[in-house]
A protein has these predicted regions:
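Long, contiguous amphipathic alpha-helices that act as assembly "spine/axial" helices in icosahedral shell
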Residues: 65, 91-155, 192-208, 370-383
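A short, polar/proline- and glycine-enriched secondary-structure boundary/capping micro-motif
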Residues: 76-77, 87, 117, 319-325
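Sequence/fold signature of self-assembling virion shell proteins
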Residues: 11-49, 162-187, 207-410
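Residue-level signature for short turns and capping positions that connect secondary-structure elements
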Residues: 70, 110, 315-317
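N-terminal "assembly arms/tails" that initiate or stabilize quaternary assembly
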Residues: 2-97, 394
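Exposed beta-strand and adjacent loop surfaces of beta-rich binding modules
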Residues: 62, 199, 290-292
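Solvent-exposed, flexible loop/coil residues
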Residues: 49, 53, 59, 72, ...
Length: 410
């Protein structure tokens, strides 16, 4: 029976060699490499809308994108026989440092790598998915930092709305609506953001898609699939925006504040002070340092803590037993969703096909580091970078959903 060993069990010389695929045929290398990429592709939702850039020639550690400016309108009539002054083109550059990512699995000597093995194939499949998720998350976290943000208003009774100005004020009543979709699309149009064959794209979480599908104007993807090539994960269209669904769409939500409790409570009345006593949970010293908390509906940064006191960056006034919530998400610590509305060319990534590889080290390839030929390994590594190129070509709509009380940060 084959056994799967812990990742770090054999950490040492055997896992730091750089010789690649020793002992594997060229056909097997190609096969496993193709398998890795095929399993990575479905996870690369955020990467599929990026402007791709080849890895720098000569193995440089930074990648560079050029941004070209626009020309002013040429409104001056031409004079017969006179050549006018031409217009120069402004070019700016955006650079990003490349980073390498990777993972591997060590397996027992029961694995025979002289032919394509089901165990190796299964591990390669899993690592392909892991690679896709990893590199897609790197891209997602970069492009979630855009400056164009719309906060979903609170939807009240009878169609009333209350504006929201901060992420930490969003609730499960702040859903993504048809009106918000139209507003985001209009903002992109006003910035002359290029489209993807006449449509903008939005990447959303299934929890948000659940709410949006209730809109009568929603058009499911199967209704136009015959005439349009669908994006990976595409589920439908609304107001000229094609929606792509993924569980990797960004969720903002703070972790529990205590080892045994999500929230804490204020211990004793606080009058305009930065030090707040608390109880209601077990917290290690400085475990909350650098995090955000909500006290009385306002957000504060924790600069330090003991097992019974928080030191905040700003003085606070609070009543005894007021609840202290995690402050990285919405109101009362609920989940907030970052829905990315994108125009073409808004951001760039490096070409993944050039910088990724699967590495299979057969049993017996580690020399004296594995004297009994007991171990083999399967892994991947990849070089990646992502950058926002045109901030005005993307809008992030932050909203709640019917699942804001249960979804976790990702």
């Amino acid at each position: 029976m084959n056994k799967l060993y812990d990742l770090q069990l054999f950490a040492g010389e055997a896992n730091t060699q750089t010789t690649g695929h020793g002992g594997l045929s060229a056909e097997m290398k190609t096969y496993y490499g193709m398998e890795l990429l095929e399993n990575a592709k479905p996870q690369l939702v955020h990467n599929q809308f990026a402007a791709t850039k080849p890895l720098p020639a000569g193995g440089g550690k930074t990648v560079e994108w050029r941004k070209f400016g626009s020309f002013d309108k040429a409104l001056t009539p031409l004079t017969e026989g006179v050549t006018p002054d031409g217009s120069g083109i402004s070019v700016s550059y955006i650079t990003k440092e490349l980073a390498q990512y990777g993972d591997y699995t060590t397996v027992s000597d029961m694995l025979d790598l002289t032919a394509i093995d089901d165990v190796v194939l299964e591990i390669t499949d899993r690592h392909g998915s892991n690679m896709g998720l990893t590199l897609d998350t790197v891209t997602r976290n970069e492009i979630q930092q855009g400056s164009q943000v719309i906060y979903a208003p609170v939807q009240g009774e009878g169609g009333s709305q209350t504006d929201v100005l901060h992420r930490y004020d969003l609730t499960d009543k702040c859903k993504l609506t048809s009106e918000l979709v139209a507003k985001a699309a209009t903002q992109l149009k006003k910035m002359n953001a290029p489209t993807f064959e006449g449509k903008y794209v939005c990447i959303i979480h299934p929890s948000v898609a659940f709410d949006l599908r209730q809109d009568p104007a929603w058009v499911a993807a199967h209704q136009y699939a015959a005439a349009t090539e669908l994006f990976s994960g595409e589920i439908g269209e609304l107001h000229g925006v094609r929606f792509v669904e993924t569980t990797e769409a960004k969720i903002f939500r703070g972790q529990d504040l205590a080892r045994n409790s999500r929230t804490l409570t204020v211990n004793g009345k606080v009058e305009n002070a930065a030090v707040v006593g608390f109880d209601g949970g077990t917290v290690a010293a400085n475990a909350l340092k650098g995090r955000y908390v909500l006290v009385g509906g306002k957000r504060y940064k924790v600069v330090g803590n003991t097992a019974s006191q928080l030191t905040l960056d700003t003085a606070v006034t609070a009543a005894d037993n007021d609840v202290i919530y995690p402050g990285e998400g919405g109101s009362q610590g609920c989940a907030v969703y970052g829905c990315l509305f994108l125009g073409k060319g808004a951001y760039g990534v490096v070409d993944l096909s050039e910088g990724t590889e699967v590495i299979v080290k057969p049993r017996g390839s580690s020399g004296t580091a594995d004297p009994l030929d007991q171990r083999s390994s399967v892994g991947w590594k990849g070089i990646h970078a992502a950058a926002i190129l045109y901030d005005e070509y993307m809008v992030r709509v932050e909203c709640g959903s019917s699942y804001s009380g249960e979804d976790k940060a990702n």
